[in-house]
Every structure is written in C-alpha cells, then in structure tokens.
Amino acid sequence: MKVSCRAYVEITDPEDLLTLDFDSLPQPVFVMGGGSNLLFTKDFPGTVLHMGNQGIRFLDSASGSARNDKNTVVSTKADGSASVISTKAEGRVEKSVRVEAGVVFDDFCAWAAEQGLWGPENLSLIPGEVGASAVQNIGAYGVEAKDIIDTVHAFDRITRTFVDIPGADCGYGYRASLFKTDWKGRYIITAVTFRLSAVPRPRLDYGGVRKALEARFLDFASGSARNDKNTVISTKADGSASVISTKADGSASVISTKVEDRVEKSVTPQMIRETVIGIRREKLPDPEEIGSAGSFFCNPVIERDHFEKIVAIAKAENGPEYEVPHYDVGERVKVPAAWMIDQCGFKGMKLGGAQVYPKQPLVIVNATGEATPDEIIALEQRVIGTIRDKYGIELHPEVEHV
C-alpha cells in the first residue's frame, strides 16, 4: 500500500544509537523490522527507524568459563571463529548463536539448517527480521521463537545504554511479549542470541509436518526400489511400509519397516525446513506477487465449555460426525481462526482491493495491489463482527496497526 513517513533512519552499526539525537527527529519514532507484520493505516507523521545490522556468529565469549567446565568444549575453526558446545546433564549439546537484528529470519533458518543445528527449522519462510521475531514471538508448526531465544540484546532509550535481557524475562506468550506492552517504545533490539541444539530435536506433530515427511521418505524409497530390480516396496493397510531387498543368493532383508520410524531416525533440520517451506508455499501467497502481512488474526484460546458450544453449532451445520479442528492448551482449547473464517463464508471474499485469501482464510491480501488501508480495515472488521455474532469469540489481529 502507498503510505509514507516524515523521516526514515537506517542503523547499520548499533553504536550509532549512542550518538543519535532522538529528540531532533520527527516524532514519534517507530522501530520497524522487515515490516511484514505491520498495517500502516495512514501516512506516518514521525520517524521510522530500521536496524539494518547484519551478521551471524557462534559466541566465543564463554571460552574462559568453558576452560573451567569439564562439560564444555570450545572449538576453534581455521578462520579464527569459535563455537562453544556445552553438554548439559541431560545429555543435550547446545550452541549459542548471536544473530544481528537486521538479518532476515529465514536466512537465519537456512544458515542453521546448513550447519545441522536444530531449533528454527519449523519457523522457516516466516517473513520478517530477527529483531522483530523477539518482539512478536513468532511461531509456526508447534515452535515459537521463545523456545530458542536465550538473550535479547537491546538499546535502552531511557538509560541510553546497551542491555542484555534473558529470554525468560521477556514475558513471552502467544504472539506476545513485554516489548509489545510495558516496554513498547523503550528498547531497540540490536541482536538476539539463540540457543540451538547439535543433537536431533525434531518437532513433527503439528500442521501436517509429519505426514508430509513420511510421504517424502516413501517417495524416496519407492524411487530407489524402482531402479533396483531386487527391491520391493510393501505397503500395509495401516500405512506402514517395508523396503525388502532380495540379494543375489536369494536371501531377503528388510531395509526399513514403518516409514514413521525412518522419519524419526533419519530426519534432518534441512529436511524439516524444506518440508515446512513446501507446506507454506502451498497455502500462503508469494509476497513477491501478492502483498499481505501473513496471518492476520491470532488463533483464539477459549474455555472448554465455550468450545463445546462451537462444536454444537458446527455439527448442526455440517452433520453429527463433523469434527471441529482444535488443539488442547492445558485446560483450554485453541480453535483455528482460519476454520471459523472459512465456516462463515469469507474465503475468497473481496472488499475493494482487499481479499480474504482463497487458499488460507487467515490471511488478508492486497489482491489488486491498489488496496487502501480503509479497505483492509473494513474487511477485517467485517470478519471480526461475523465471528463474534456466530461464535461469541472476539478475534484479535496479529498484525500491528500503525
């Protein structure tokens, strides 16, 4: 959308924040990451500040303590860089990686997967930058940024000092943090230290990731078998498959049993990343072609008795065997906002240049490239009002309105 600001400041060296005269800038000053989760409702009267600092590195500041810790190894590479590998009591091997705020988050995901490190692979292809990921607590496919954030590094505009804030102190919740509430406007995030694992920690039981991986493994096995006249693929009624190899002497051996066993034992961060990217590209618009802010609404978490009322409505409309998609969150229930929006007939609906995306109704897109902020907001409010009237649920936008 065509919106403007009075002034724009690009910071590539965080040290420049110490000498920046904030009071001389057009007010207010708004810190923006990649802008992928923002809806500017009109021209911005103040200054947009963007942290453009780049870099990903293993932390080596723990070298001193590492030498005194028999459970820690410091590995120095030929180029002089160092990584600290700390083996905890439970046997996990972790690496601390500092990523500068201006790094595109998916570039960080790609880097981690290339290194064979576990943690951000399920978050692949989420648009935006690393600094903003710590504000929004981005999440997808069963993983949230808070799960891997160790420390948030920031500039405190009040004290004019650089601070290191433990992730545990950031008040993280579902798409929430203190950076969005009590600390809003105070801190400018300059970098984030992530805690990644060098040993397998796959999270597959969300959003079809496991099913897609199993299909991928079965396709690979089938392809190999088709090129080997001595190999047979046996698929059972329960969906499990065996790859049976017949040797020249006539004996047979089972190479693999259930596909899900192969997935658990052989999956890599890169495989999960590629699978997640494939799923996202199937249902989400390409930002190079259609403008959007990604998921527009948060998925509501409601009381169980309220959920039962929604189930009753759904069964009345779709039949007694119909099952409402949901996820248990302790004693409460998370209901996909996309499902409710679809059930209310909004999928593909247009209002001016704004549209509820046909493939994923959780997304509102600038379908024509000429949508105005007013059209986006009008469509948003129509969705919210209809969901409220039908299900008694107040949807809240995930997108920040500026």
Model-derived features: where do they sit?
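Phosphate/pyrophosphate- and phosphate-bearing ligand-binding catalytic cores of soluble enzymes
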Residues: 38, 163-219, 236, 247, ...
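Generic detector of N-terminal low-structure segments
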Residues: 60, 219-222
